Design a protein with these regions (language model features):
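C-terminal and inter-domain tail/linker signature
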Residues: 1-140
Length: 140
């Protein structure tokens, strides 16, 4: 697949799955054996893990957004610099709802195979994200 097509697939995934919560597309966009090398603890691989992740994010951040700030491809891999942000309206990963708008920088590398996500690696500023959500008593 051409690099431009791979970029379009990743953009579509962020727009429709991660920003709109369209779980109906997950099985078509993610390979059955999809491997997320940086999944949250306890999250399964495959499309089921993606659905669980998106559901978890929208449960905690009803206005959850992932804005692609930079994206490029080389062969079967796409790299994207993403800003993840939303309002922490419900508990998330052990932290009670803060009502704060939180933001996190992320870097993602996706390997595509046959037009579908086959593997994912990500780097996130999880410490800063948790600090933004935490109350002063919790170190926020």
């Amino acid at each position: 697949m051409a690099e431009a097509e791979n970029i379009a697939i990743v953009r579509r995934t962020y727009d429709e799955v991660f920003n709109r919560g369209n779980l109906d597309l997950v099985d078509a966009i993610f390979a059955p054996n999809f491997k997320n090398h940086t999944a949250p603890p306890g999250m399964q691989d495959g499309p089921g893990g993606v659905k669980a992740l998106v559901t978890m994010l929208f449960a905690a951040f009803p206005d959850d957004r992932h804005d692609i700030e930079d994206i490029f491809a080389s062969g079967d891999r796409v790299a994207a610099r993403v800003r993840h942000h939303g309002t922490h309206a419900r508990p998330f990963m052990g932290l009670p709802a803060s009502g704060r708008h939180v933001s996190q920088e992320q870097m993602h590398i996706v390997r595509l195979e046959g037009g579908r996500w086959a593997e994912h690696w990500g780097v996130r500023d999880d410490l800063s994200f948790r600090q933004q959500m935490a109350s002063p008593e919790q170190g926020g």
